[in-house]
A protein has these predicted regions:
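Helix-to-loop junction immediately C-terminal to a conserved catalytic motif
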Residues: 59
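Conserved ABC ATPase "signature" region
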Residues: 75, 123-141
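Catalytic Walker B motif of ABC-type/P-loop ATPase nucleotide-binding domains
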Residues: 171-174
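Conserved catalytic motifs of ABC-family nucleotide-binding domains
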Residues: 167
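Conserved ABC ATPase signature
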Residues: 146-150, 154
């Protein structure tokens, strides 16, 4: 019991006094937050609010101008090249547009991280890649398809399977439901919750999807004007009278996404389903 409580409060990501500038343009100004073990943490904000830049800084694709970013106990600014490679093996990333290579079939796309970071033989890599596809709800025959033959929902699942290839403890999701119909999006909702429940994954996601936020997010951080404007659960944010937060809960879309009972889905067409579309 004590071990479980300690894990729940363990800090997996710590951002302190983060500043990011491109010339005279300020992207982030004094941003600080923490993400705890096995938490589903969401970043939201309008276009140009710095969400994508922040994600890039968290996954070692970009350096902030100043401040501290610690991920899985490591200070990202202090890492050597070999340390950075080792740390990247401990997380997975699902990019917004999938990031799958069009010239490779799905099975080989999913197996790429294993080929890059392990010395396993090709047969075992293919077997492991097949297991990851099954884990995300895709049938074995999907592995033989090229990405162009996949539906939007299948593409998201295949991309997620690749992000899971190295059994990460931390998962980054960039707009995981973007472009999906409600049924397919509901499948992603269910899958995110299942992955956390089964493997204790810590999940950080960027999304504009209010239904997804209500369904799965433990806490949500709101970025606007280069600053972290608010952070809390969806019910806490919904009750907050803040100019950067209110637009997410006002208007037809905000009201439609908000459940009468936060414990139940607001949109019956969007109830979580594990069936891929």
């Amino acid at each position: 019991m004590a071990a479980a409580a300690a894990a729940a409060t363990e800090v997996v990501i710590e951002v302190k006094n983060l500043h990011t500038r491109f010339g005279s343009h300020v992207v982030h100004s004094d941003i600080s937050f923490e993400v705890r073990r096995a938490e589903i943490f969401a970043l939201i904000g309008g276009s140009g609010s710095g969400k994508s830049t922040l994600l890039r800084e968290l996954i070692l694709l970009q350096k902030p101008s100043s401040g501290t970013v610690r991920v899985l106990g490591a200070d990202l600014q202090a890492l050597g090249a070999d340390e950075a490679v080792a740390l990247r093996r401990r997380w997975g990333v699902m990019f917004q547009h999938g990031g799958l290579f069009g010239s490779l079939d799905v099975l080989h796309n999913v197996g790429l991280p294993l080929r890059e970071h392990t010395v396993l033989d090709d047969g075992l890599i293919d077997q492991l890649a097949g297991w990851k596809l099954a884990m995300t709800g895709l049938a074995p025959e999907v592995g033989a398809l090229v990405p162009a033959a996949l539906s939007g929902g299948m593409m998201k699942r295949a991309s997620l399977a690749r992000a899971l290839a190295l059994d990460p403890e931390l998962l980054f999701l960039d707009e995981p439901t973007a472009g999906l119909d409600p049924v397919s999006a509901g499948g992603v909702d269910a899958l995110v919750l299942q992955l956390r429940a089964l493997f204790g994954l810590t999940i950080v996601m960027i999304t504009h999807d209010l239904d997804l936020l209500w369904q799965v997010a433990d806490r949500v951080a709101v970025l606007a004007d280069g600053r972290l404007q608010a952070i809390g659960t969806m019910p806490e944010l919904a009750a907050l009278d803040h100019p950067a937060v209110r637009p997410y809960f006002e208007g037809a879309r905000g009201r439609a996404a908000r459940p009468a009972d936060p414990a139940h889905p607001a949109n019956p067409a969007r109830e979580p389903s594990s069936k891929p579309k």
